[in-house]
Swiss-Prot record:
Residues 1-57, 360-390 are annotated as: Disordered. Residues 7-25, 360-376 have a biased composition (Basic and acidic residues). Zn(2+) binds at residues 399, 401, 604, 619. Forms a complex with DabB. Belongs to the inorganic carbon transporter (TC 9.A.2) DabA family. GO terms for molecular function: zinc ion binding. Its cofactor is Zn(2+). This is Probable inorganic carbon transporter subunit DabA. It is found in: Cell membrane. It comes from Haloquadratum walsbyi (strain DSM 16790 / HBSQ001). It comes from the Archaea. InterPro entries: DabA. Part of an energy-coupled inorganic carbon pump. Keywords: Cell membrane, Membrane, Metal-binding, Transport, Zinc.
Length: 931
């Protein structure tokens, strides 16, 4: 890629220039932090002075940097569209109670934080909000409302907060200045989009290698949209000095508000800048940009346009009475209270289903436990089996993704199969490069740093002497031709300048292609499938190279630096001990102790056409990438005889006839592709039987999902979902994770008889095999956090698709391979499109409720795990998620997390209507406050 050569030739980055100048000019402060620290997740800048104090002994640059860092906390990172991560758009406010966070979001971004009255009314009338639960919740929060009057109050806009306090309508008072704001935005956006382009532009912005601040100066002087370019021609060398110079005209008491307003004016673009600085990609190394440089450009533009910064101290967004700030008193908006009742209604149903299933299995499980002991002293009882005394036909491990719940249920119904749930990166934090990929990807959650580099290479290098070599040659010829065509089309289609006249300039040939995709998408799918089938499967021609020798890399990975990551110093491959640890961790977290003849790790990916948000449908645990590579790596590890030997020393005895395979579940079509090249002849019948049953499961799952997509049960389900996958005009190829509402952590037997409607994340866990609680802690700090991100993204994209989502797909345009905007310009959109959450304009599909988590374990064990997990308890205490424990040591009784590591027994209410709660860590009953 272009970034490689640019990165090597670049002599001085913007960050280096800014840091050196700061050290020269800011001698009064000992901190040498770079501007990258102003984004969330970076090290904070320590200060000893109050920045709001006008004491001039405190360096202006120091104060500016503090304010930038503080403002950046409210703008979460925005991942590029090619690897879009569904994250919480209000992640910067998770240290606040939910109702205060949405009020802050309304003030800063103008976004609605709660469903509107029509949504609540529909949920109430359809039973999604139970009337009795709503009544109890309204009483609990001390309102004067009945259920009917509460819904009516929202509809009329006369809501009151809890505690019988009414709010005061707030406004920003800056409506007259909205044009000034737009004048700055449209100029800075023009140069941001040019600078941050990730390979789609035919002509690059000049001087990008010098950094955004310098590049902006070089072009702004020729920008006819800027009336007074003299103010930009000779600015300070360091952008921090430029910011301080502009701010010097204002009292220091106003600096914080001015900086926050400028940083949050375009949260999409600033979120992308934060992503770049936090992840230090090759694009960032080659073309550096910081929030300080961006802020300097904005402020210089305001100066050149003669726009006073104190007149645009906040975006022109009004804040409704339902989202007012409650900073001084602990009150709850009525929407919050009704939302809680909605969530409790769902949670009650989920807990009842799980508890009933747990009770039904209890005696069966006890019987199986005794039966297992008679099989042999070396056989452990298996918690996740329907019948542990019968060896399963196969065991399949899926991602915890809600879409896996549907296919798992249908697979289990076709035979003696066991399915498990595990994070879709299968516990291996790697940077992965496929056999024919030009760049590598981080195949791990965004909250986890990659630890290893793994690349694929050809199984047989001598293509003239081996069948696999012939496969490689044919594969590469076809793939090169295909990729060349795709690159040309993508370059034209994704460039704003060329997109609108693309079809005209490419002539009738492309028009025929568009017509075929529009009129005959099923035929197109069939043709593409036949072409794909002529190519050898990737597992036939290549395999992941796990050896630590750096020489074993593919033809594309001869450089340490690739097009996606800079100066990559990650070690190649995995040591033997690392392989053992990753395999053992997977089995221990899932509670998998006994094995069938075939054990499969099934990643997942999507298949869509003309979909900028396609990566949002891929595996979130793989950072918006396909999960197949992660599955292949873990399967290869587990088939290693040396690894199996070491696992036996740890009490994990894998039978000699157990074979591990990998696969990939295409969630759009529910097709599961198995990678079976390494399967011995002795297991071919097992594989054929499994593949036949997977085809049956696909048909059943497709029929179930199609009903929710179209409601038409008369069409062929397989044909229709294949059409959706190939139809370039299809705005809703699948629902993705829409509908997600719950997360169950426990053995499959809790839910195997329950239709969870594809709304629940399922992570396998056996508390009896987790003596130290470390497995539970790993699940709570990893998968739970990721699912909360996903849930929050869907929630906010549903309640305000214009601010927290991305509006309609029909009017979206891609920008420089980094994002999308509505129409022909503006801020980068930060969330999912309306088609991902709504059936129609007036008909929601996704129910906007927060995540209800259920853990099957002793409440004391969960309390112990939470005690040191501040990041998790913060989400719980601030009502971003809820937690219920089903305690198997107490006859599967349920306990709801209250606050401060305290619990209330199910049936005794949740908070205010209960007089006592238990504190398991001290094994006694203690008095609890009402909150």
């Amino acid at each position: 890629m272009t970034t490689e050569s640019t990165s090597e030739s670049k002599t001085k980055t913007e960050t280096e220039t800014e840091t050196e100048t700061e050290q020269r000019n800011d001698l009064s402060n000992s901190s040498n932090s770079s501007e990258d620290a102003s984004c969330p997740g970076s090290s904070p800048v320590s200060t000893e002075s109050d920045p709001d104090n006008d004491d001039t002994s405190v360096s202006a640059n120091t104060i500016v940097r503090q304010y930038i860092e503080s403002a950046a906390e409210s703008v979460g990172a925005l991942w590029p569209i090619h690897s879009f991560v569904t994250a919480n758009p209000l992640s910067g406010f998770e240290d606040q109670p939910f109702h205060k966070a949405v009020a802050a979001g309304a003030t800063r971004f103008g976004g609605d934080g709660y469903p509107d009255s029509d949504v609540f009314e529909h949920a109430w009338k359809t039973g999604q909000i139970n009337q009795e639960i709503l009544k109890k919740t309204l009483d609990e929060y001390e309102t004067d409302h009945t259920p009917a009057s509460a819904i009516a109050a929202i509809d009329s806009g006369t809501q009151a907060t809890s505690g019988r306090d009414t709010g005061v309508r707030m406004g920003t008072g800056v409506d007259d200045e909205i044009n000034n704001w737009d004048e700055i935005d449209k100029r800075v956006i023009k140069w941001l989009s040019a600078f941050l382009d990730a390979g789609s532009a035919e002509w690059e912005m000049p001087n990008r290698g010098s950094g955004f601040y310098t590049a902006f100066q070089s072009v702004a002087t020729y920008d006819t949209m800027i009336p007074d370019t003299d103010l930009i021609e000779d600015p300070p060398a360091d952008p921090i000095d430029a910011v301080s110079t502009v701010l010097a005209s204002y009292p220091r008491s106003q600096w914080s508000e001015i900086i926050e307003a400028q940083i949050t004016a375009l949260p999409g673009w600033t979120g992308l800048i934060c992503y770049r600085t936090e992840n230090e990609t090759a694009w960032q190394t080659a073309y550096p940009i910081t929030l300080v440089g961006y802020l300097a450009a904005r402020m210089m533009l305001a100066d050149a346009l003669s726009i006073p910064l104190d007149s645009i101290s906040r975006p022109a967004h009004s804040v409704t009475s339902t989202e007012e700030s409650t900073a001084d008193i602990e009150t709850y908006p009525l929407q919050e209270i009704i939302l809680i009742a909605w969530e409790r209604t769902y949670r009650e149903e989920l807990i009842e289903q799980i508890a009933d299933t747990a009770d039904n299995h209890k005696h069966e499980h006890d019987h199986d436990h005794d039966a297992d002991k008679t099989i042999g002293d070396d056989v452990e009882p298996q918690a996740d089996s329907r019948s542990s005394s019968v060896r399963p036909d196969a065991q399949l491990v899926f991602c915890i993704d809600t879409r896996s719940e549907i296919i798992r249920r249908h697979i289990e119904s076709t035979g003696q199969y066991e399915t498990y749930g595990y994070a879709g990166f299968f516990g291996i934090p790697m940077r992965y490069r496929g056999y024919d990929d030009a760049v590598s990807i981080d195949a791990c959650p965004p909250i986890v740093d990659a630890q290893h580099r793994i690349s694929e290479s050809a199984k047989h290098a001598d293509e003239n002497k081996t069948p696999n070599g012939q496969y490689n040659s044919r594969y590469e010829r076809i793939r090169d031709i295909y990729d060349a065509g795709i690159d040309i089309v993508d370059s034209l289609a994704s460039n704003v300048t060329t997109a609108f006249n693309f079809v005209e300039t490419t002539g009738s040939g492309y028009g025929v292609g568009l017509a075929l995709r529009t009129l005959f998408p099923q035929r197109v799918y069939d043709i593409l499938t036949r072409i794909e089938n002529r190519l050898p499967r990737i597992d036939v021609i290549s395999q992941p190279q796990l050896n630590t020798a750096t020489g074993e890399v593919n033809q594309y990975s001869h450089n340490e630096t690739d097009g996606s990551h800079s100066e990559d110093v990650l070690p190649y491959g995995l040591t033997h001990q690392e392989r053992v640890e990753y395999a053992a961790s997977a089995f221990e977290l899932m509670g998998l102790k006994t094995f069938g003849r075939v054990v499969g790790f099934i990643g997942h990916a999507s298949q869509t056409a003309n979909n900028p948000f396609g990566s949002s449908l891929d595996c979130g645990a793989c950072a918006g990438n396909a999960g197949g590579p992660s599955a292949r790596v873990l399967a290869q590890i587990c088939n290693d005889d040396a690894v199996k030997t070491s696992l036996r020393d740890r009490g994990i005895d894998i039978p000699v006839d157990t074979v591990f395979i990998a696969g990939e579940h295409t969630t759009t079509t529910d097709k599961i592709t198995l990678y079976t090249e390494a399967i011995p002849d002795s297991h071919q019948d097992d594989i054929r039987s499994l593949q036949a049953d997977l085809s049956i499961a696909q048909e059943d799952a497709a029929a179930e999902r199609l009903e929710s997509l179209s409601g038409d049960t008369t069409v062929d389900a397989i044909q229709d979902i294949e059409r959706r996958a190939a139809d370039w005009a299809e705005t809703r190829p699948e629902w993705g994770l829409a509908g997600n509402a719950g997360f169950v952590i426990g053995p499959r037997r809790l839910t195997d008889d329950v239709d969870l409607e594809g709304r629940v994340f399922l992570h396998s866990y056996d508390w009896q095999q987790d003596e130290t609680g470390s497995a539970l802690e790993s699940i709570l700090t990893g998968p739970l956090i990721v699912t909360q991100w996903i849930n929050a993204q869907y929630y906010f994209a549903t309640v305000d698709t214009a601010v927290y989502g991305s509006g309609s797909k029909v009017t979206q345009n891609p920008v420089g391979n980094v994002g999308i905007y509505q129409g022909n310009g503006g801020d980068l959109m930060r969330g999912l499109p309306v088609q991902s959450v709504r059936k129609s304009t007036d008909n929601l599909y996704h129910q906007p409720i927060r995540l209800s988590t259920v853990v099957h374990a002793p409440v004391s064990k969960v309390t112990h795990a939470l005690a040191d997990l501040e990041s998790v308890t913060e989400l719980l205490d601030n009502n971003w998620i809820s937690l219920t424990v089903i305690d198997p040591t107490r006859e599967n009784d349920a306990f709801h997390y209250v606050k401060g590591l305290k619990w209330l027994p199910h049936g005794e209410g949740y908070k205010h209507d209960a007089t006592e709660c238990i504190s398991p860590q001290i094994n006694q009953t203690v008095s609890s406050s009402s909150d």
